[in-house]
Amino acid sequence: MTAENTPLQGNLFVESEENLLDANSLQNTNSVKDSNLNDEELSKNAELRPRKRKKSVLLQNSVGEQTEDFSNDERPAWSHHSLVEINELTPVLRHYVELKQKHPERILLYRLGDFFECFFEDAIGLSELLELTLTGKEGGKKIGRVPMAGIPHHAAERYCSTLIQKGLSVAICDQLESIQNKEGKLLKRGITRILTPGTVLEEGMLQAKKNNWLAAILIESNSQTNQLKWGLASADISTGEFTVKEGNGIDTLEQDLLNIEASEIICEQLDVDISKKWQSNRIKITQQSKTSFSLQEAKAILKKHYNLKTINGLGLNETELALRAAGGLLYYLKETNPIHNIGVKNKCSKVVLDFPKNNLRGDSLIIDAQTRRNLELTKTQKDGHFQGSLLCAIDRTLTAMGGRCLRRWIENPLINSELILQRQRLITLLVEKRPLRKALRNLLRTMGDIERLSGRASAGQAGARELVAIADCLEKLPKLAANLQNLSINPPKWFSKLENINPELTKLAEEIKDKLIDNPPLSITEGNLINDSVDKILDGLRNQLDDQNEWLSNQEKKERNISGNNNLKLQHHRTFGYFLAVSKSKANTVPDHWIRRQTLANEERFVTPALKERESKIFQLKVKAANREYDLFCALRELVGGYAPIIRETAKAIAGLDVLLGLAELASTNNYCAPNIIDKKSLSNSRSINIKGCRHPVVEQMLVEEKFQANDIELGDGVDLIILTGPNASGKSCYLRQIGLIQILSQIGSWIPADKASISIADRVFTRVGAVDDLAAGQSTFMVEMAETAFILNQATQDSIVLLDEIGRGTSTFDGLSIAWSVSEFLAENIKSRTIFATHYHELNELAKKMGNVANFQVLVHETGEDIHFLHQVIPGGSNRSYGIEAARLAGVPKSVINRARGVLKRLEEKNKG
């Protein structure tokens, strides 16, 4: 069977009415016209013979597939579609090239029968990326064979997921009509889906506990300040979140882009001058020549998307660049959703987004990308793994929604003390009320990701199982609300969504459960989705199918009697239809009216004229029933999609509750305490950080054989700068990081790993920990270090936390000491930020004698002969030794090298004394 003659299969990515089998066009030969198939007769039939619901059964079909082996083919010569003369190609390849010319930057998957095929450069690239066999296909008499590689249609999502993870975009070209009555004509095909890293909705292509951001940026030069001004819009179309912001300076934009970790970043074609100013090697940007970022078109598309007469209520008129970036993002979403352009009757295919929220600077604790990396908030600094990060250590959420919410909290800690305390009070209540915490967590344990599921429904991509999952979750809401009644505290505003459940959601759950069977199949185009007694026309069709099945059963008995073969079976094959199966030994004794259909190794298959005639009618009934079920399902999906905004509001509240429950679980099982949050508006010592017995939240969980050494800190109340000295590998960096992490945990409302704490709110956290060459940017280790230091000195305020681990190491000793000294003085005298500076420049201990707001601390070491033992204990006072040679010995440096180092050190010390 050739690819063009293979029966049409439902597309994985879009289920359209055109992809359904049409009872009026299929099986032209031997078709049976029956007046009983009109809707009025079917409805009457259903009233006379009402159907009773049966227990749901998940139907599974396994269809064998055959693939042609081209492993011996030579590699075709044509390596790019632009090398061929399009008019010399076969019709299929000509259409492929026409589509490829419209989507040159995307991998084009072209549906041919049971496979999605690629040709030319896409085939070569796909074969290398996915380790597929590179084959060939005849391109025409003058062309010869062209490169071809393909993937089975049923595995398309898995392969596309791999491509998306590699940052590639995919255009899906599917068959839009059935082949039964085409009589050799070329099938109608068109782009039904465009998959890009920032626009995917498929569960298998998304990280469950991480937002998938699509960002759009607009950059313009400010002629007055000679500085670049920018607008940024970012949206997660899977959850509906949509934020915009404006700013100045390319460095600030780059920090924001690095912070959100967008899967895809688009922008208008950059001017040459802007491109020269911004040559970042850390951010990949796709310039979109077709994307519209003009003010007029941005306003138009915003009004159309949200069905508004004016956009004044969105509050974006004062931020023109952000407004235009938002318009560009929506325009890109429209371009990558081609459903309406090809005539597919998918009634519900709109991506539902929240109204754009203006994300103003100053609403949250600012954490730059370098600090996020140094503190290992969401991934480790060394290898980028989730394991070993702060998020991994504290995540006790039970839902994907809660996991994403916790990540957002960590990335954007609060600076409003009342909001912080609202969260903290709820966590305290949940710590104290263990039975309530346990009951709520048990309810959330089986809660699906209704935030994303409702988005898939609104986009017309949810299947029946996903609608049932939504209903299952919505059914739990009343019980969740009952457990939250009569709380003795004042919860955040979003909490009301859980205390007072919208009754419409309960009704929606009931309607889904009433219409869909309990365990529906994956496919939504082959029937067996809708319950009995939902639709009279469907019931009438099912009644007639029952009659046909009864006829088949009687026919089997009849043919057994005629043939005298009690082992005869009447069976059905998806390709060959109904047939009578007999063993080889009895194949020669069958009745004369039997017609041989197929010969197998152990069996012969036959049909009869009556069976062939009846088969056509049964097929017609099945197709009409399947189409009816699909229409009913689409109507239900559209209904659910309409509730997406309400469902998502509830989902966000569930996510917040999940985070609070998880943090309460963390606090109760890890001996955390609730810090006293100091509001700088009400107390004079608003900059104080006083923590007793603080611990590193990640490291202490990794220790198995030893207990973590807790330490104290007092900062901001008379002391603005701590000079921390001590040996290498003694725990100075760990101490610095744990202070930063505890500050962040405090400002998300969490309890912290400490015995007791009083913490004031910070506006920013800065770190300068370690440095590496940035060869791509032409910067040495020392230049990277100085750039990071300059950034801190230019941005820090007296409300900031600054954590420095060495400055001036990449130059001569005296140069480095001079820089470290002057930086310390500037921080203590000019900025007065709360700073901890870990250093091996013991000369900096002299600063405490000259400046009243500087204090010296050291990490203790116990010496026994030549051995040293790190106690990891921080105490007042400065150290005058670094124990670098001892640390080198512990690291395994050869003994001869160690001995030589001691000799050199002794001579240098004597020379210094002299």
Curated annotation (Swiss-Prot):
It comes from the Bacteria. Residues 28-74 are annotated as: Disordered. One of its GO terms (cellular component) is cytosol. InterPro entries: DNA_mismatch_repair_MutS, DNA_mismatch_repair_MutS-lik_N, DNA_mismatch_repair_MutS/MSH, DNA_mismatch_repair_MutS_C, DNA_mismatch_repair_MutS_clamp, DNA_mismatch_repair_MutS_core, DNA_mismatch_repair_MutS_N, DNA_mismatch_repair_MutS_sf. It holds the Pfam family MutS_III. Disulfide bonds: none annotated. ATP binds at residues 726-733. GO terms for biological process: mismatch repair. GO terms for molecular function: ATP binding; ATP-dependent DNA damage sensor activity; damaged DNA binding; mismatched DNA binding. Keywords: ATP-binding, DNA damage, DNA repair, DNA-binding, Nucleotide-binding. SMART domains: MUTSac (SM00534), MUTSd (SM00533). NCBIfam families: mutS1 (TIGR01070), PRK05399.1 (NF003810). This protein is involved in the repair of mismatches in DNA. It is possible that it carries out the mismatch recognition step. This protein has a weak ATPase activity. Belongs to the DNA mismatch repair MutS family. This is DNA mismatch repair protein MutS. The lineage of its organism: Bacteria, Bacillati, Cyanobacteriota, Cyanophyceae, Synechococcales.
